[in-house]
Amino acid sequence: MEGVLSQLAVLVLEDGTKFHGRAIGAKGITVGEVVFNTSITGYQEIITDPSYSHQIVTLTHPHIGNVGTNSNDEESSKIYIKGLIIRDLSLTASNYRNKKSFSSYLKENNIIAISDIDTRKLTRILRTKGSQNGCIIEDKKQNYSIAYNKAKNFISLQDLDLAKKVSTKSIYNWDQGSFTFKKNNFFSINKQKFLFHVVVYDFGVKRNILRMLVDRGCYLTVVPAITDPKTVLNLSPDGIFLSNGPGDPRPCDYAIHAIQYFLKTNIPIFGICLGHQLLALASGAKIVKMKFGHHGGNHPVKDIKNNRVIITSQNHSFTVDTENLPNNIEITHSSLFDGTLQGLSLTNKSAFSFQGHPEASPGPHDASYLFDYFIKLIVSQKTTLSN
């Protein structure tokens, strides 16, 4: 059971709105862009998603921490969020996989967090006014003026290259598949039994993305975001995967140029989230900042090609502008919430992308068929080359 949460804390937004609560994480002060996530489950996966770099995440579900934490549910090697805002911290964790309480996990990872916040009110403010910068101070004095000034002066995430900061610094291989509850472990495949070799550009990749590719017979080489395209081609990949990641894709010139280089070849390309936006930019489309973004596991998306609706996991603050799209871009998916572009394919290349997270974690797996389509493109290309 958690100890008594007696330390006071304050959250202040850049418009001057303040919320008083209790500190449930590390001591200190933090500042970032405040966003909200509507997922009911998967709080550990959310806070370890590199896509949340430089952001303070508000979880709209009222009860957080009830299943504790464990290392198997981490989506990366560290926590990238700037801070966490919740309504109520569960004082007990009831799950056979629990290894550590959520509050202890936050403190151990030096994450400042605040509870006892009216998250419904906060979410309404963000929906009405758009995402705002905010500051959390864990302090008995709850110094409002310091928090307000820090929130007011925090840098905008627009035109900021965050992918380079969260990306791996060296090339590595990955052969771990999905978690199997029967064996209570992740399965792995002998390298000789893999069917395909896929190079993954790490712009902030989640582990479950890698696992779902391995599940489909892919041996993975994960490369840094700034990797030269010639280095990738020397690895002789059967396919290239462009991962998720944080922030604005527009400053990532190195990635855009690399993708344009790959589009001159016939190697199948699949991008998600930030990778989707980078493929769009490389193909001549434009990107715009959204009012408050899409963050949650309940977003309905229409699959235009197959005329069906899928429920998806989403986490992005930028979107592809649908006005004046290049002729070779075909819209394959659209949001049923606001009509924004959710998927595209290039009519003249074996390249496609999806704005949401088909790997979920957390969220539904309705869009996992996109991984199968990627494999289908790889098989088709290998068949063409062998004939």
UniProtKB/Swiss-Prot annotation:
Record has Amino-acid biosynthesis as a keyword: yes
UniProt KW keywords: Amino-acid biosynthesis, Arginine biosynthesis, ATP-binding, Glutamine amidotransferase, Ligase, Nucleotide-binding, Pyrimidine biosynthesis
Coiled-coil segments: none
Binding site for L-glutamine: S51, G245, G247, L274, Q277, N315, F318
Domain Glutamine amidotransferase type-1 per the UniProt entry, residue ranges: 197-384
Domain of life: Bacteria
Function statement: Small subunit of the glutamine-dependent carbamoyl phosphate synthetase (CPSase). CPSase catalyzes the formation of carbamoyl phosphate from the ammonia moiety of glutamine, carbonate, and phosphate donated by ATP, constituting the first step of 2 biosynthetic pathways, one leading to arginine and/or urea and the other to pyrimidine nucleotides. The small subunit (glutamine amidotransferase) binds and cleaves glutamine to supply the large subunit with the substrate ammonia.
Name the UniProt record assigns to this protein: Carbamoyl phosphate synthase small chain
Organism: Buchnera aphidicola subsp. Acyrthosiphon pisum (strain APS)
